[in-house]
From Swiss-Prot:
Coiled coil regions, renumbered to chain: 99-148
Signal sequence region: none
A Pfam family that the UniProt record links to this protein: Snf7
PANTHER family xref list: CHARGED MULTIVESICULAR BODY PROTEIN (PTHR22761), CHARGED MULTIVESICULAR BODY PROTEIN 5 (PTHR22761:SF12)
Protein function: Probable peripherally associated component of the endosomal sorting required for transport complex III (ESCRT-III) which is involved in multivesicular bodies (MVBs) formation and sorting of endosomal cargo proteins into MVBs.
Higher taxonomy: Eukaryota, Viridiplantae, Streptophyta, Embryophyta, Tracheophyta
Gene3D superfamilies: 6.10.250.1710, ESAT-6-like
Protein name: Vacuolar protein sorting-associated protein 60.1
One BP annotation, GO: protein transport
Region (Disordered) location: 1-29, 175-235
Length: 235
């Protein structure tokens, strides 16, 4: 059957922009190397022209140098053409990469949009408002509880301005009664030190000279103390 209808040929995939750009860059680099070699030859011919005298020999050197120069110009034209192709391919590659980035961005945005829609289904603004209202109510109840717990007991609520003025007048009268001769209340006067010795009425400490009765002198020893009487010896 293959002989009659023929076998299907395997088609190769078309080259990508990057493959084509790499191949052209290699060709351009090869041409650039050839141009550098021709520059070296031209430098040699220039040195030979300086050393040779005008005549047939110098003309032969000029002819060879002219041939090398023509080859260089041809290679430079090919190099410029290849670099232009590379530039065009780079522009196309940049545009293609930009489109790929745009596609990926669109895909990411669609996925994010779908995810946000799913999240918005579980979060409703009405539920949030209701939650806020409930929290405000709870805070009000908490404030009332704290205020109730902080109340003071046994404080009369029927006090008015007359009661206040009466209390102040009574305090002023009490303070006037406590005011002493110098016009200063007793509670503002400095404290006086108490003479504890006079209150206790303690006698003065006896001295060595006043201990003996008047009219009779008492003998003292070398230390100022009363001398011990010596017993008399009987014969």
């Amino acid at each position: 059957m293959r002989r009659v209808f023929g076998a299907k040929k395997n088609t190769e995939p078309p080259p990508s922009i990057q493959d084509a750009s790499d191949r052209i860059n290699k060709r351009g680099d090869s041409v650039e190397d050839k141009i550098k070699k021709l520059d070296v030859e031209l430098c040699k011919y220039k040195e030979q022209l300086k050393k040779t005298r005008p005549g047939p020999a110098q003309e032969a050197v000029k002819a060879r140098a002219m041939r090398v120069l023509k080859q260089k110009k041809m290679y430079e034209g090919q190099r410029d053409m290849l670099y232009n192709q590379t530039f065009n391919l780079d522009q196309v590659s940049f545009a293609a990469e930009g489109l790929k980035d745009a596609q990926q961005t669109m895909t990411a945005l669609k996925s994010a949009n779908k995810e946000l829609k799913g999240m918005m289904k579980t979060v409703k603004i009405q539920d949030i408002d209701n939650l806020q209202d409930e929290m405000m109510d709870l805070m009000d109840v908490s404030s009332e509880i704290q205020e109730s717990l902080g109340r003071s007991y046994n404080i009369p609520d029927g006090l008015d301005e007359d009661d206040l003025m009466g209390e102040l007048d009574a305090l002023e009268a009490d303070m006037g009664n406590e005011t002493e001769a110098d016009g200063m209340p007793s509670y503002l006067q400095p404290d006086t030190e108490t003479d504890y010795d006079s209150e206790l009425n303690l006698p003065a400490a006896p001295t060595g000279h006043n201990g003996a009765p008047h009219g009779r002198a008492q003998a003292e020893d070398e230390f100022g103390l009363p001398a011990v009487p010596r017993a008399s010896l009987r014969g």
